[in-house]
């Protein structure tokens, strides 16, 4: 089925001004409209046809925001129109029912339960909500890494100024020898005053995946809670939040789940919900109800609705198949560059320590100059990283990326390295 007919088929779904939440769900599902494709090569060709891409450069920077595939985008536009037609009727009658439905679908995707999942606007909101709402006392200690995301580190700095919390900062090696090396690094900073550890599931600047379950087991043995930054994980690779055994987890869904901008996930272990103060006050008096943590007032509800379509699209591909593809794309270019003179791959070589994101630098060129040269001379878009012992460009291809495009990237880096 070609792209035009595929989108046309999706557009044939019925639409009426006022329908029930259950009818809305049925009529706005992708589940019955995506073609069954068993051949892997044909699948990825079909997937690429679902994206409208600029032809004046190669996009290897999907890590910030993941372009929405057209089948999902088509449904997102339908949601916008539907909510616009119903207006206040939708907000008063169907908003909460649909949000509960989408939350249930999201919980299933990440291997948890709806009573532990809240829809937010991004990972920053999810994690900063926990950091700012944690019951800190003066002299409490928190642990995080130099490689963690900036806005969360800034929130820890703010609670240090506000409550007198002591922040202890470690540096995660780019090429750890074992899980135990990472676990011991965090454990070395724990004292009797340590209350919370923040740790990346995947470090956003290098793509390194950390041994979260082992870190949580270690921390809990000391009575310390763990908050996980999984901004790049939901929709990229297969995992279960419940299996990680963490206390808190945050992710951005507009990254690798490819929802519209402004969708995130917050997980709070049901035994910890009562202790976190909401970002904004609300009327929910039950402190064990996670819904009290994601009250943000009126917001673009059609974005929340499109989460369901993004889940449908991911399930059509298959999360394990997507994980395999993402890891293949990253290893395709990184393995070709690892033993090249003047080239430094900042992502672990161990196949289990990374997935789709990688980082590569040049000893003869600064990261900013490297990114500029890649774009200006070779028409390849990346992002420069030059902090926390990481010097290079983050390379984040997508499921629409071809090996021909990665060959052009590898060739460009080799030429720049000489």
Regions found by a protein language model. Name each.
Residues 2-418:
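Pyridoxal 5′-phosphate
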């Amino acid at each position: 089925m070609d792209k035009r007919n595929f989108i046309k088929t999706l557009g044939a779904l019925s639409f009426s001004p006022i329908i029930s939440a259950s009818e809305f769900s049925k009529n706005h599902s992708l589940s019955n409209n995506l073609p069954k494709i068993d051949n892997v090569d044909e699948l990825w060709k079909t997937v690429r046809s679902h994206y409208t891409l600029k032809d004046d450069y190669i996009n290897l920077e999907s890590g910030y925001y993941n372009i929405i595939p057209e089948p999902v985008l088509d449904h997102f536009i339908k949601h916008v129109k539907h909510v616009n037609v119903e207006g206040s009727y939708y907000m008063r009658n169907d908003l909460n029912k649909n949000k509960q439905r989408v939350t249930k679908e999201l919980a299933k995707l990440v291997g948890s339960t709806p009573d532990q999942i809240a829809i937010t606007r991004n990972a920053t909101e999810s994690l900063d909500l926990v950091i700012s709402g944690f019951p800190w006392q003066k002299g409490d200690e928190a642990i995080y890494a130099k490689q963690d995301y900036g806005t969360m580190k800034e929130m820890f700095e703010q609670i240090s100024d506000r409550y007198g919390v002591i922040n202890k900062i470690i540096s995660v090696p780019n090429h750890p020898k074992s899980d135990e090396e990472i676990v011991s690094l965090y454990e070395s900073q724990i004292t009797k005053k340590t209350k919370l550890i923040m740790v990346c599931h995947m470090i956003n600047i290098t793509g390194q995946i950390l041994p979260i379950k082992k870190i949580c087991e270690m921390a809990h043995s000391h009575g310390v809670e763990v908050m996980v930054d999984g901004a790049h994980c939901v929709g990229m690779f297969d995992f279960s939040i419940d299996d990680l055994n963490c206390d808190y987890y945050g992710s951005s869904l507009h990254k690798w789940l490819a929802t519209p901008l402004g969708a995130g996930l917050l997980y709070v272990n049901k035994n910890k919900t009562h202790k976190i103060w909401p970002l904004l006050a609300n009327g929910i008096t039950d402190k064990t109800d996670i819904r009290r943590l994601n009250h943000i007032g009126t917001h673009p509800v059609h974005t929340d609705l499109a989460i369901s379509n993004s889940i449908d699209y991911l399930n059509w591909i298959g999360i394990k198949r997507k994980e395999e593809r993402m890891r293949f794309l990253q290893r395709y270019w990184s393995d070709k560059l690892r033993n090249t003179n003047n080239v430094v791959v900042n992502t672990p070589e161990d196949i289990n320590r990374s997935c789709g994101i990688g980082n590569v630098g040049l000893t003869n060129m600064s990261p900013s100059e490297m990114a500029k040269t890649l774009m200006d001379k070779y028409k390849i878009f990346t992002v420069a990283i030059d902090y926390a012992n990481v010097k290079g460009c983050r390379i984040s291809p997508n499921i629409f990326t071809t090996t021909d495009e990665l060959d052009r990237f590898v060739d460009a880096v080799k030429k720049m390295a000489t």
